[in-house]
């Protein structure tokens, strides 16, 4: 079984994906981490994030063992990741990796922005997570401060709105819900409530409802 979870930045899809995978004993892939890893590689090399050729080279040399690096969660890396993820050749370079991950039995949960529309259009269950931008900014600010980073909620909100605009309007794999996706509004749900709502969606699909 393949469960695709999509949604904008800081909507809670990553936490939901991880918890849902644990519930069903499936593998989990936060596909945003892949693009963040490419972004970090470019930043570490002092390369121009706008250079698509360099971004493709970084994508082809990714080391999955480094996907847990704490630096991948910084706002700077996130901003560059949003830029490189818009490059068609970068997305193509990472497509095979993601599809092979999804195909591994007994099942997988992948979260990102184009899982249900591009990466796994035949996914058994598709969930599109949404949340109010102000709520998302507050969550992202608290996450940053919990890591000891300085964060201004107004600045974070502006960045989120900018990323939403870029993600929704990019020509390749724009952020949008698949036609058969189940929309889950996460604005007023805590982690447990969000998980229960997602499980209800999965079970309804499995039961053919």
From Swiss-Prot:
Catalytic reactions of this protein: CMP + ATP = CDP + ADP; dCMP + ATP = dCDP + ADP
UniProt binding sites for ATP: 7-15
InterPro entries linked: Cytidylate_kin, Cytidylate_kinase_dom, P-loop_NTPase
Pfam families recorded: Cytidylate_kin
Main location group: cytoplasm
Recorded GO CC terms: cytoplasm
Enzyme class, UniProt record, top EC level: transferase
Record EC number: 2.7.4.25
Keyword entries, A-Z: ATP-binding, Cytoplasm, Kinase, Nucleotide-binding, Transferase
Tagged with keyword Transit peptide: no
Any one biological process term the GO annotation gives: pyrimidine nucleotide metabolic process
Keyword Nucleotide-binding: yes
GO molecular-function terms, A-Z: ATP binding; CMP kinase activity; dCMP kinase activity
HAMAP family: Cytidyl_kinase_type1
Family the UniProt entry places it in: Belongs to the cytidylate kinase family. Type 1 subfamily.
Name of the protein this chain belongs to: Cytidylate kinase
């Amino acid at each position: 079984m393949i469960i695709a979870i999509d949604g904008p930045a800081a909507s809670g899809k990553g936490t939901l994906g991880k918890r849902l995978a644990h519930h069903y004993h499936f593998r989990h892939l936060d596909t945003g981490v892949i693009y963040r890893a490419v972004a970090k590689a470019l930043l570490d090399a002092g390369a121009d994030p706008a250079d698509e050729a360099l971004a493709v080279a970084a994508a082809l040399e990714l080391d999955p063992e480094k996907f847990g690096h704490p630096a991948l969660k910084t706002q700077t890396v996130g901003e560059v990741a949003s830029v490189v993820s818009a490059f068609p050749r970068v997305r193509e370079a990472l497509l095979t990796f993601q599809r092979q991950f999804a195909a591994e039995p007994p099942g997988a949960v992948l979260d990102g922005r184009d899982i249900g529309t591009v990466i796994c259009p035949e996914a058994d269950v598709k969930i599109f997570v949404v949340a109010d931008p102000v709520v998302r900014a507050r969550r992202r600010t608290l996450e940053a401060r919990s890591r000891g980073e300085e964060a201004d909620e107004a600045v974070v909100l502006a960045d989120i709105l900018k990323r939403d605009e870029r993600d929704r309007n990019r020509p390749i794999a724009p952020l949008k819900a698949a036609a058969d996706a189940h929309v889950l509004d996460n604005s007023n749900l805590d982690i447990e409530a969000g998980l229960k709502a997602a499980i209800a969606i999965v079970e309804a699909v499995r039961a053919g409802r």
